[in-house]
């Protein structure tokens, strides 16, 4: 459903942001 797509997109965005943050810290 639409809600699952929104949650999936948010999860991917959060994952990318977390990876980017980790890369900046290293």
From Swiss-Prot:
One of its GO terms (cellular component) is extracellular region. It comes from the Eukaryota. Keywords: Amidation, Amphibian defense peptide, Antibiotic, Antimicrobial, Secreted. The modification Valine amide is found at residue 26. Expressed by the skin glands. It is found in: Secreted. InterPro entries: Dermaseptin_dom. One of its GO terms (biological process) is defense response to bacterium. Belongs to the frog skin active peptide (FSAP) family. Dermaseptin subfamily. This is Dermaseptin-B5.
């Amino acid at each position: 459903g639409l809600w699952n797509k929104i949650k999936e997109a948010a999860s991917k965005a959060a994952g990318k942001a977390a990876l980017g943050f980790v890369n900046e810290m290293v």
